[in-house]
Curated annotation (Swiss-Prot):
Listed name of the protein: GDP-mannose 6-dehydrogenase
Top-level taxonomy: Bacteria, Pseudomonadati, Pseudomonadota, Gammaproteobacteria, Pseudomonadales
Broad EC category: oxidoreductase
Native source species: Pseudomonas syringae pv. syringae
Pfam families referenced in this protein's UniProt entry, alphabetically: UDPG_MGDP_dh, UDPG_MGDP_dh_C, UDPG_MGDP_dh_N
Function: Catalyzes the oxidation of guanosine diphospho-D-mannose (GDP-D-mannose) to GDP-D-mannuronic acid, a precursor for alginate polymerization. The alginate layer causes a mucoid phenotype and provides a protective barrier against host immune defenses and antibiotics.
Length: 438
Protein backbone atom coordinates (compact mmCIF):
# COMPACT_ATOMS: atom_id res chain seq x y z
CA UNK A 1 0.00 0.00 0.00
CA UNK A 2 1.10 3.59 -0.57
CA UNK A 3 1.15 5.36 2.79
CA UNK A 4 2.01 8.89 3.90
CA UNK A 5 2.91 9.42 7.54
CA UNK A 6 2.54 12.90 9.01
CA UNK A 7 4.82 13.58 11.95
CA UNK A 8 8.15 11.76 12.29
CA UNK A 9 8.52 11.69 16.05
CA UNK A 10 8.51 8.52 18.14
CA UNK A 11 5.30 7.12 16.69
CA UNK A 12 5.63 8.30 13.10
CA UNK A 13 9.28 7.30 12.65
CA UNK A 14 8.65 3.81 14.05
CA UNK A 15 5.61 3.34 11.83
CA UNK A 16 7.59 4.51 8.80
CA UNK A 17 10.37 2.05 9.50
CA UNK A 18 8.12 -0.92 10.25
CA UNK A 19 5.69 -0.38 7.37
CA UNK A 20 8.44 0.14 4.79
CA UNK A 21 10.21 -2.98 6.08
CA UNK A 22 7.03 -4.93 5.35
CA UNK A 23 7.05 -3.80 1.72
CA UNK A 24 4.73 -0.81 1.80
CA UNK A 25 5.65 2.36 -0.07
CA UNK A 26 6.00 4.98 2.65
CA UNK A 27 6.37 8.75 2.42
CA UNK A 28 7.38 10.34 5.72
CA UNK A 29 6.21 13.94 6.10
CA UNK A 30 7.37 16.53 8.62
CA UNK A 31 7.77 20.29 8.80
CA UNK A 32 11.31 19.77 10.10
CA UNK A 33 13.78 19.64 7.22
CA UNK A 34 16.34 18.27 9.68
CA UNK A 35 14.20 15.19 10.33
CA UNK A 36 13.57 14.73 6.62
CA UNK A 37 17.29 14.89 5.84
CA UNK A 38 17.97 12.28 8.51
CA UNK A 39 15.28 9.97 7.14
CA UNK A 40 16.49 10.31 3.56
CA UNK A 41 20.01 9.44 4.70
CA UNK A 42 18.82 6.36 6.55
CA UNK A 43 19.32 7.97 9.95
CA UNK A 44 16.83 7.83 12.78
CA UNK A 45 15.48 11.15 14.12
CA UNK A 46 14.97 9.49 17.52
CA UNK A 47 16.82 7.05 19.75
CA UNK A 48 15.08 3.71 19.35
CA UNK A 49 16.89 0.34 19.21
CA UNK A 50 16.66 -1.26 15.77
CA UNK A 51 14.92 1.65 14.07
CA UNK A 52 17.88 2.98 12.12
CA UNK A 53 18.41 -0.41 10.49
CA UNK A 54 14.78 -0.44 9.34
CA UNK A 55 15.03 3.09 7.98
CA UNK A 56 18.25 2.27 6.11
CA UNK A 57 16.57 -0.77 4.58
CA UNK A 58 13.57 1.31 3.52
CA UNK A 59 15.74 3.95 1.87
CA UNK A 60 18.00 1.42 0.13
CA UNK A 61 15.06 -0.54 -1.29
CA UNK A 62 13.21 2.56 -2.39
CA UNK A 63 10.27 1.81 -0.10
CA UNK A 64 10.81 4.88 2.08
CA UNK A 65 11.44 8.54 1.47
CA UNK A 66 10.91 11.76 3.38
CA UNK A 67 9.53 15.12 2.32
CA UNK A 68 8.32 18.43 3.67
CA UNK A 69 5.83 18.72 0.80
CA UNK A 70 2.47 17.78 2.32
CA UNK A 71 0.49 18.06 -0.90
CA UNK A 72 2.87 15.90 -2.93
CA UNK A 73 2.82 13.21 -0.24
CA UNK A 74 -0.97 13.05 -0.18
CA UNK A 75 -1.27 12.93 -3.96
CA UNK A 76 1.30 10.12 -4.13
CA UNK A 77 -0.41 7.88 -1.55
CA UNK A 78 -3.72 6.17 -0.80
CA UNK A 79 -3.68 6.32 2.99
CA UNK A 80 -2.41 8.99 5.38
CA UNK A 81 -1.47 8.32 8.99
CA UNK A 82 -1.57 11.30 11.32
CA UNK A 83 1.13 10.79 13.96
CA UNK A 84 1.70 14.35 15.16
CA UNK A 85 2.01 15.21 18.82
CA UNK A 86 -0.92 16.11 21.07
CA UNK A 87 0.83 17.72 24.06
CA UNK A 88 -0.89 18.94 27.22
CA UNK A 89 -2.07 22.48 27.69
CA UNK A 90 -1.44 24.15 31.04
CA UNK A 91 -4.98 23.23 32.13
CA UNK A 92 -4.47 19.56 31.24
CA UNK A 93 -6.52 19.58 28.06
CA UNK A 94 -5.01 18.46 24.76
CA UNK A 95 -3.31 20.85 22.37
CA UNK A 96 -4.79 20.01 18.97
CA UNK A 97 -3.07 22.67 16.86
CA UNK A 98 -0.87 20.11 15.07
CA UNK A 99 -3.81 17.79 14.39
CA UNK A 100 -5.91 20.64 13.04
CA UNK A 101 -3.10 21.93 10.83
CA UNK A 102 -2.46 18.53 9.26
CA UNK A 103 -6.17 17.96 8.68
CA UNK A 104 -6.44 21.28 6.86
CA UNK A 105 -3.48 20.40 4.63
CA UNK A 106 -4.96 17.00 3.83
CA UNK A 107 -8.43 18.43 3.22
CA UNK A 108 -7.23 21.04 0.73
CA UNK A 109 -5.43 18.38 -1.32
CA UNK A 110 -8.39 15.99 -1.21
CA UNK A 111 -10.53 18.66 -2.87
CA UNK A 112 -8.81 17.94 -6.20
CA UNK A 113 -7.93 14.28 -5.69
CA UNK A 114 -10.04 11.96 -7.82
CA UNK A 115 -9.38 8.69 -5.98
CA UNK A 116 -10.61 7.75 -2.52
CA UNK A 117 -8.14 8.50 0.26
CA UNK A 118 -8.22 7.12 3.81
CA UNK A 119 -7.11 9.25 6.76
CA UNK A 120 -6.02 7.37 9.87
CA UNK A 121 -5.54 9.16 13.18
CA UNK A 122 -2.70 7.45 15.01
CA UNK A 123 -2.14 10.33 17.44
CA UNK A 124 -3.66 9.97 20.89
CA UNK A 125 -6.84 12.05 21.02
CA UNK A 126 -9.75 12.21 23.45
CA UNK A 127 -13.11 10.62 22.59
CA UNK A 128 -15.03 12.91 20.27
CA UNK A 129 -11.97 14.53 18.71
CA UNK A 130 -12.26 12.80 15.35
CA UNK A 131 -16.02 13.36 15.15
CA UNK A 132 -15.95 16.97 16.33
CA UNK A 133 -12.59 18.25 15.10
CA UNK A 134 -10.93 16.02 12.50
CA UNK A 135 -13.89 15.16 10.27
CA UNK A 136 -15.40 18.68 10.21
CA UNK A 137 -12.05 20.17 9.16
CA UNK A 138 -11.50 17.52 6.49
CA UNK A 139 -15.01 17.97 5.10
CA UNK A 140 -14.86 21.75 5.18
CA UNK A 141 -11.47 21.98 3.47
CA UNK A 142 -12.14 19.26 0.90
CA UNK A 143 -15.78 19.95 0.14
CA UNK A 144 -16.27 16.20 0.33
CA UNK A 145 -18.10 13.80 2.66
CA UNK A 146 -16.43 11.47 5.16
CA UNK A 147 -17.34 7.84 4.65
CA UNK A 148 -18.42 8.56 1.08
CA UNK A 149 -15.68 10.46 -0.71
CA UNK A 150 -12.85 9.70 1.71
CA UNK A 151 -12.29 7.29 4.57
CA UNK A 152 -11.59 8.01 8.23
CA UNK A 153 -10.33 5.68 10.93
CA UNK A 154 -8.56 5.70 14.27
CA UNK A 155 -5.66 3.36 14.97
CA UNK A 156 -4.31 3.90 18.51
CA UNK A 157 -0.72 2.82 19.01
CA UNK A 158 0.58 0.81 21.95
CA UNK A 159 4.30 1.37 21.42
CA UNK A 160 6.69 1.79 24.32
CA UNK A 161 9.85 3.79 23.84
CA UNK A 162 12.96 1.55 23.75
CA UNK A 163 10.87 -1.50 22.75
CA UNK A 164 8.78 0.09 19.99
CA UNK A 165 9.91 -2.20 17.15
CA UNK A 166 9.06 -5.31 19.13
CA UNK A 167 5.78 -3.77 20.24
CA UNK A 168 4.87 -3.04 16.62
CA UNK A 169 5.71 -6.56 15.46
CA UNK A 170 4.17 -8.34 18.47
CA UNK A 171 1.23 -6.22 19.62
CA UNK A 172 -1.24 -7.52 22.22
CA UNK A 173 -3.99 -6.40 19.86
CA UNK A 174 -4.65 -4.08 16.95
CA UNK A 175 -7.52 -1.66 17.56
CA UNK A 176 -9.30 -0.07 14.61
CA UNK A 177 -11.91 2.61 15.09
CA UNK A 178 -13.80 2.92 11.83
CA UNK A 179 -16.08 5.68 10.59
CA UNK A 180 -17.28 3.33 7.88
CA UNK A 181 -16.65 -0.31 6.98
CA UNK A 182 -14.56 0.50 3.90
CA UNK A 183 -12.14 2.53 6.01
CA UNK A 184 -11.82 -0.32 8.49
CA UNK A 185 -11.21 -2.81 5.69
CA UNK A 186 -8.38 -0.72 4.24
CA UNK A 187 -6.70 -0.33 7.61
CA UNK A 188 -7.14 -3.97 8.55
CA UNK A 189 -5.26 -5.04 5.42
CA UNK A 190 -2.12 -3.40 6.88
CA UNK A 191 -2.12 -5.64 9.93
CA UNK A 192 -3.46 -9.02 8.85
CA UNK A 193 0.01 -10.56 8.80
CA UNK A 194 0.61 -9.67 12.46
CA UNK A 195 -0.09 -12.41 14.99
CA UNK A 196 -2.56 -10.45 17.08
CA UNK A 197 -6.33 -10.05 17.24
CA UNK A 198 -7.75 -7.22 15.16
CA UNK A 199 -10.53 -5.46 17.05
CA UNK A 200 -12.83 -3.17 15.07
CA UNK A 201 -14.95 -0.66 16.95
CA UNK A 202 -16.61 2.71 16.50
CA UNK A 203 -14.19 5.63 16.42
CA UNK A 204 -15.10 7.02 19.86
CA UNK A 205 -14.65 3.59 21.45
CA UNK A 206 -11.18 3.28 19.92
CA UNK A 207 -10.26 6.75 21.14
CA UNK A 208 -11.37 5.83 24.67
CA UNK A 209 -9.55 2.48 24.60
CA UNK A 210 -6.20 4.21 24.18
CA UNK A 211 -6.74 6.49 27.17
CA UNK A 212 -8.09 3.66 29.27
CA UNK A 213 -4.97 1.59 28.62
CA UNK A 214 -2.61 4.44 29.47
CA UNK A 215 -4.50 5.47 32.60
CA UNK A 216 -4.61 1.82 33.70
CA UNK A 217 -0.84 1.57 33.32
CA UNK A 218 -0.42 4.74 35.36
CA UNK A 219 -2.82 3.39 37.98
CA UNK A 220 -0.86 0.15 38.30
CA UNK A 221 2.42 2.01 38.82
CA UNK A 222 0.85 4.29 41.42
CA UNK A 223 -0.89 1.41 43.20
CA UNK A 224 2.31 -0.61 43.43
CA UNK A 225 4.23 2.41 44.71
CA UNK A 226 1.68 3.17 47.42
CA UNK A 227 1.57 -0.47 48.53
CA UNK A 228 5.37 -0.48 48.56
CA UNK A 229 5.50 2.68 50.66
CA UNK A 230 3.07 1.28 53.22
CA UNK A 231 4.85 -2.07 53.24
CA UNK A 232 8.19 -0.43 53.93
CA UNK A 233 6.67 1.60 56.77
CA UNK A 234 5.48 -1.60 58.49
CA UNK A 235 8.80 -3.37 57.94
CA UNK A 236 7.87 -5.44 54.88
CA UNK A 237 9.55 -5.60 51.46
CA UNK A 238 6.90 -4.31 49.04
CA UNK A 239 8.59 -6.10 46.14
CA UNK A 240 8.05 -9.42 47.86
CA UNK A 241 4.40 -8.58 48.45
CA UNK A 242 3.71 -7.53 44.87
CA UNK A 243 5.60 -10.50 43.46
CA UNK A 244 3.11 -12.83 45.13
CA UNK A 245 0.12 -10.60 44.30
CA UNK A 246 1.05 -10.74 40.61
CA UNK A 247 1.13 -14.54 40.63
CA UNK A 248 -2.64 -14.60 41.02
CA UNK A 249 -3.88 -14.60 37.44
CA UNK A 250 -7.40 -15.73 38.41
CA UNK A 251 -8.38 -12.56 40.27
CA UNK A 252 -5.58 -10.02 40.73
CA UNK A 253 -4.39 -9.90 37.11
CA UNK A 254 -7.46 -10.92 35.16
CA UNK A 255 -10.70 -9.62 33.69
CA UNK A 256 -12.36 -10.12 37.08
CA UNK A 257 -13.34 -6.84 38.75
CA UNK A 258 -12.61 -5.03 35.47
CA UNK A 259 -16.19 -4.56 34.27
CA UNK A 260 -17.88 -1.18 34.69
CA UNK A 261 -20.85 -1.38 37.03
CA UNK A 262 -21.93 -0.69 40.57
CA UNK A 263 -19.96 -0.05 43.75
CA UNK A 264 -18.05 -2.72 45.68
CA UNK A 265 -19.23 -3.90 49.08
CA UNK A 266 -19.40 -6.83 51.46
CA UNK A 267 -17.72 -7.60 54.74
CA UNK A 268 -14.14 -7.52 53.39
CA UNK A 269 -13.29 -4.91 50.78
CA UNK A 270 -14.59 -1.72 52.45
CA UNK A 271 -13.28 -2.76 55.86
CA UNK A 272 -9.84 -3.64 54.57
CA UNK A 273 -9.48 -0.50 52.45
CA UNK A 274 -10.31 1.61 55.49
CA UNK A 275 -7.94 -0.34 57.74
CA UNK A 276 -4.95 -0.12 55.39
CA UNK A 277 -5.44 3.57 54.62
CA UNK A 278 -5.87 4.31 58.34
CA UNK A 279 -2.60 2.53 59.09
CA UNK A 280 -0.87 4.44 56.29
CA UNK A 281 -2.11 7.71 57.73
CA UNK A 282 -1.01 6.79 61.25
CA UNK A 283 2.48 6.17 59.85
CA UNK A 284 2.48 9.45 57.89
CA UNK A 285 2.58 7.56 54.59
CA UNK A 286 0.88 9.41 51.73
CA UNK A 287 -1.47 7.15 49.75
CA UNK A 288 -3.64 9.45 47.58
CA UNK A 289 -4.82 6.69 45.25
CA UNK A 290 -5.81 4.27 48.01
CA UNK A 291 -7.40 7.09 49.99
CA UNK A 292 -9.63 7.90 47.02
CA UNK A 293 -11.17 4.43 46.79
CA UNK A 294 -13.95 4.80 49.35
CA UNK A 295 -14.84 8.27 48.06
CA UNK A 296 -15.07 6.94 44.52
CA UNK A 297 -17.19 4.02 45.70
CA UNK A 298 -19.61 6.34 47.47
CA UNK A 299 -19.77 8.46 44.33
CA UNK A 300 -20.95 5.46 42.31
CA UNK A 301 -23.82 4.88 44.75
CA UNK A 302 -24.72 8.55 44.35
CA UNK A 303 -24.65 8.12 40.56
CA UNK A 304 -27.21 5.33 40.83
CA UNK A 305 -29.43 7.45 43.06
CA UNK A 306 -29.18 10.38 40.64
CA UNK A 307 -30.35 8.12 37.80
CA UNK A 308 -33.46 7.14 39.76
CA UNK A 309 -34.12 10.73 40.78
CA UNK A 310 -33.88 11.89 37.16
CA UNK A 311 -37.13 10.07 36.34
CA UNK A 312 -40.52 11.54 37.20
CA UNK A 313 -41.47 8.48 39.23
CA UNK A 314 -41.66 7.64 42.92
CA UNK A 315 -42.36 3.89 43.07
CA UNK A 316 -39.06 2.01 42.92
CA UNK A 317 -38.36 -1.72 42.86
CA UNK A 318 -34.89 -2.68 44.09
CA UNK A 319 -34.00 -6.16 42.86
CA UNK A 320 -31.22 -7.38 45.11
CA UNK A 321 -30.15 -6.15 48.53
CA UNK A 322 -27.15 -8.29 49.43
CA UNK A 323 -23.81 -7.12 48.04
CA UNK A 324 -23.79 -9.89 45.41
CA UNK A 325 -26.06 -12.62 44.11
CA UNK A 326 -26.01 -15.98 45.86
CA UNK A 327 -25.51 -14.66 49.41
CA UNK A 328 -27.57 -13.10 52.19
CA UNK A 329 -24.67 -10.95 53.44
CA UNK A 330 -25.96 -7.39 53.77
CA UNK A 331 -22.92 -5.93 55.49
CA UNK A 332 -21.60 -2.88 53.66
CA UNK A 333 -23.76 -3.72 50.65
CA UNK A 334 -23.89 -0.68 48.35
CA UNK A 335 -27.50 -1.64 47.61
CA UNK A 336 -28.32 -1.07 51.27
CA UNK A 337 -26.70 2.36 50.97
CA UNK A 338 -28.74 3.06 47.84
CA UNK A 339 -31.95 1.90 49.54
CA UNK A 340 -31.20 4.15 52.51
CA UNK A 341 -30.76 7.15 50.20
CA UNK A 342 -33.98 6.43 48.32
CA UNK A 343 -35.99 6.07 51.52
CA UNK A 344 -34.47 9.25 52.90
CA UNK A 345 -35.64 11.17 49.84
CA UNK A 346 -39.19 9.88 50.08
CA UNK A 347 -39.24 7.23 47.36
CA UNK A 348 -41.77 4.41 47.75
CA UNK A 349 -39.35 1.47 47.83
CA UNK A 350 -40.04 -2.24 47.51
CA UNK A 351 -37.19 -4.77 47.72
CA UNK A 352 -36.88 -8.28 46.30
CA UNK A 353 -33.96 -10.56 47.11
CA UNK A 354 -34.51 -14.31 47.00
CA UNK A 355 -31.58 -14.87 49.36
CA UNK A 356 -32.67 -12.40 52.03
CA UNK A 357 -35.47 -13.49 54.35
CA UNK A 358 -35.75 -11.14 57.31
CA UNK A 359 -36.70 -13.88 59.77
CA UNK A 360 -33.43 -15.66 58.98
CA UNK A 361 -31.18 -12.60 59.18
CA UNK A 362 -29.23 -12.65 62.43
CA UNK A 363 -26.02 -11.65 64.17
CA UNK A 364 -23.83 -8.94 62.67
CA UNK A 365 -25.89 -9.11 59.49
CA UNK A 366 -29.07 -8.20 61.36
CA UNK A 367 -27.37 -5.52 63.43
CA UNK A 368 -26.04 -3.88 60.28
CA UNK A 369 -29.29 -3.80 58.31
CA UNK A 370 -31.33 -2.59 61.28
CA UNK A 371 -28.88 0.23 61.87
CA UNK A 372 -29.28 1.31 58.26
CA UNK A 373 -32.95 0.52 57.52
CA UNK A 374 -34.80 -0.20 60.81
CA UNK A 375 -38.07 -1.05 59.02
CA UNK A 376 -36.49 -3.21 56.33
CA UNK A 377 -38.89 -6.08 57.06
CA UNK A 378 -41.78 -3.99 55.73
CA UNK A 379 -39.90 -3.26 52.50
CA UNK A 380 -38.90 -6.83 51.64
CA UNK A 381 -41.37 -8.65 49.41
CA UNK A 382 -40.93 -12.26 48.29
CA UNK A 383 -43.50 -11.88 45.50
CA UNK A 384 -41.31 -11.03 42.50
CA UNK A 385 -44.18 -10.25 40.13
CA UNK A 386 -45.89 -7.97 42.62
CA UNK A 387 -42.68 -6.02 43.20
CA UNK A 388 -42.35 -5.49 39.45
CA UNK A 389 -46.00 -4.66 38.83
CA UNK A 390 -46.20 -2.11 41.65
CA UNK A 391 -43.14 -0.14 40.50
CA UNK A 392 -42.39 2.62 38.03
CA UNK A 393 -38.60 2.23 38.12
CA UNK A 394 -36.85 -1.13 38.42
CA UNK A 395 -33.24 -1.31 39.64
CA UNK A 396 -31.29 -4.44 38.70
CA UNK A 397 -28.94 -4.60 41.68
CA UNK A 398 -27.17 -7.94 41.44
CA UNK A 399 -26.61 -10.73 38.97
CA UNK A 400 -29.54 -12.96 39.89
CA UNK A 401 -30.30 -14.52 36.50
CA UNK A 402 -34.04 -13.97 36.80
CA UNK A 403 -33.36 -10.22 36.49
CA UNK A 404 -31.64 -10.48 33.10
CA UNK A 405 -34.79 -10.52 30.97
CA UNK A 406 -35.89 -7.19 32.42
CA UNK A 407 -32.77 -5.50 31.04
CA UNK A 408 -33.47 -6.47 27.46
CA UNK A 409 -37.27 -6.37 27.46
CA UNK A 410 -38.49 -3.60 29.72
CA UNK A 411 -42.01 -4.11 31.11
CA UNK A 412 -44.54 -1.76 29.53
CA UNK A 413 -44.70 1.66 31.15
CA UNK A 414 -41.64 1.15 33.34
CA UNK A 415 -38.00 2.20 33.46
CA UNK A 416 -35.11 -0.15 34.16
CA UNK A 417 -31.74 0.84 35.63
CA UNK A 418 -29.09 -1.82 35.09
CA UNK A 419 -26.27 -1.71 37.65
CA UNK A 420 -24.68 -5.05 36.75
CA UNK A 421 -24.35 -5.24 32.96
CA UNK A 422 -27.30 -7.41 31.96
CA UNK A 423 -28.13 -5.16 29.00
CA UNK A 424 -26.99 -6.76 25.75
CA UNK A 425 -26.37 -3.34 24.18
CA UNK A 426 -25.57 0.11 25.53
CA UNK A 427 -29.11 1.21 24.70
CA UNK A 428 -32.27 -0.88 24.84
CA UNK A 429 -34.51 -1.22 21.80
CA UNK A 430 -37.35 0.63 23.50
CA UNK A 431 -35.08 3.23 25.09
CA UNK A 432 -36.51 2.56 28.56
CA UNK A 433 -33.52 0.70 30.02
CA UNK A 434 -30.32 2.47 31.02
CA UNK A 435 -27.01 1.22 32.37
CA UNK A 436 -25.04 2.99 35.07
CA UNK A 437 -21.88 3.05 32.92
CA UNK A 438 -23.33 2.49 29.46
Amino acid sequence: MRISIFGLGYVGAVCAGCLSARGHEVVGVDISSTKIDLINNGKSPIVEPGLEELLQKGISTGKLRGTTDFAEAIRATDLSMICVGTPSKKNGDLELDYIESVCREIGYVLRDKATRHTIVVRSTVLPGTVANVVIPILEDCSGKKAGVDFGVAVNPEFLRESTAIKDYDLPPMTVIGEFDKASGDVLQSLYEELDAPIIRKDIAVAEMIKYTCNVWHATKVTFANEIGNIAKAVGVDGREVMDVVCQDKALNLSQYYMRPGFAFGGSCLPKDVRALTYRAGSLDVEAPLLNSLMRSNTSQVQNAFDMVASYDARKVALLGLSFKAGTDDLRESPLVELAEMLIGKGFDLSIFDSNVEYARVHGANKDYIESKIPHVSSLLNSDFDQVINDSDVIILGNRDERFRALANKTPEGKRVIDLVGFMANATSEDGRAEGICW
